[in-house]
A protein has these predicted regions:
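Short, surface-exposed "cap/lid" segments of acyl-processing enzymes
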Residues: 24-62, 66
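Conserved alpha/beta-hydrolase
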Residues: 60-80
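N-terminal cap/lid segment of alpha/beta-hydrolase-fold proteins
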Residues: 1-26
Length: 211
């Protein structure tokens, strides 16, 4: 697919959040991707696509092959450390994400789905729960942070209050201490009030790597 473009969105006074955006006139949905680790999408490579190694970023071209707007969320310019879970549930981060959602909605009427992986699942969940304007149509969490020792871990948030379609995707042999598969099953049980919801375990693949 043709590459997207980098944009800067003003989210707070004196602060902006860069995004890498692929816009399509035939988009059926807008996918807002929250990467793991400290967030962001890395540098732009020679092919004009983000070169970050995170799962959601390195698969960006695959998303763009389908009729979706694809938004990869960068790091705010004031240097908030998004490797810390507490910063991903803080009002400042949520304010940034709310401004981002408004900017996306102004650009396209397509339903907005938030997708997070690893630490990005904290951001995606918190932003969905903070949405009081029905901007978010659905939520996808991959390799969810479920360890209670992590501030903002998904099961520590009020996920039973979610009222949007929610999909949990997890590798059956995820070896990360923060993403243990058996704890994801417990997480899914807290989504009983969320209609529809689904837990999908996958197996196989290449050599494991951290995201």
């Amino acid at each position: 697919p043709p590459p997207g473009q980098t944009e800067r969105l003003t989210t707070r006074p004196g602060v902006s959040v860069p995004i890498y955006a692929v816009w399509r006139s035939d988009a059926r949905a807008t996918l807002v991707l929250f990467s793991g680790g400290a967030g962001g999408y890395g540098q732009i490579g020679s092919d004009s696509w983000p070169a970050g190694g995170n799962f959601l970023i390195r698969t960006g071209k695959r998303w763009a092959h389908h009729p979706f707007n694809v938004i990869m969320v960068g790091r705010p310019t004031d240097g908030i450390d998004l490797s810390l879970g507490r910063n991903r549930i803080d009002t400042t981060h949520l304010e940034d994400n709310r401004a981002l959602l408004h900017a996306v909605r102004e650009r396209s009427p397509a339903p907005i789905w938030l997708i997070g992986t690893s630490m990005g699942t904290i951001s995606a969940t918190a932003s969905a729960l903070a949405d009081r304007e029905a901007l978010v149509a659905g939520l996808v969490l991959t390799s969810s942070i479920v360890a209670f020792k992590v501030d903002g871990a998904v099961p520590k948030q009020d996920i039973s209050a979610l009222r949007i379609p929610t999909l949990l995707v997890h590798h059956a042999k995820d070896a990360c201490w923060g993403c243990r598969p058996h704890e994801v099953r417990a997480l899914a049980r807290h989504l009983q009030q969320t209609k529809p919801h689904r837990l999908l375990f996958i197996e196989g693949g290449g050599t494991p790597q951290g995201d």
